[in-house]
């Protein structure tokens, strides 16, 4: 069954932050810019987030919290919300995935999937 009222697309761009990293201390900092597009038929508010962060050694960390960067944006149909945040890994490569918990203006709660994306120091992947 397709729910055309509640469709959210999530895109992520990443970059390595050498100025905030300390490779000799196994500290690799990354920024990620997320674009959340409401492709549904009703306004939707982002209430909370759930991230699963995995480093290159397979260690995982789960992060849950209200909103994103201090906001719980209401996204109109056809509109986008973009924000930038960051994370630090102990390895040169890793990945993130997760979901946003959304609430449609019709009172229906739903999850918007965040597809897995890679974090990698330039040249770390062949």
Swiss-Prot record:
Entries under InterPro entries matching the protein: ApaG_domain (IPR007474), ApaG_sf (IPR036767), Uncharacterised_ApaG (IPR023065)
Entries under SUPFAM superfamilies matching the protein: ApaG-like (SSF110069)
The ApaG domain, residue ranges: 2-126
Recorded superkingdom: Bacteria
GO BP of this protein: error-free translesion synthesis
HAMAP family in the record: ApaG (MF_00791)
Entry protein name: Protein ApaG
């Amino acid at each position: 069954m397709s729910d055309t009222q509640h469709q959210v697309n999530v895109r992520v761009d990443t970059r390595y932050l050498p100025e905030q990293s300390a490779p000799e201390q196994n500290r690799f900092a990354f920024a990620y810019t997320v674009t959340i597009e409401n492709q549904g038929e009703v306004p939707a508010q982002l209430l909370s987030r759930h991230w699963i962060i995995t480093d290159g050694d397979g260690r995982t960390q789960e992060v849950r919290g209200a909103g994103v960067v201090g906001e719980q944006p209401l996204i109109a149909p056809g509109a986008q919300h973009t924000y930038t945040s960051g994370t630090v890994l102990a390895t040169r490569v890793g990945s993130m995935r997760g979901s946003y918990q959304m609430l449609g203006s019709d009172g229906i709660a739903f999850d918007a999937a965040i597809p897995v994306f890679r974090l990698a120091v330039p040249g770390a992947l062949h």
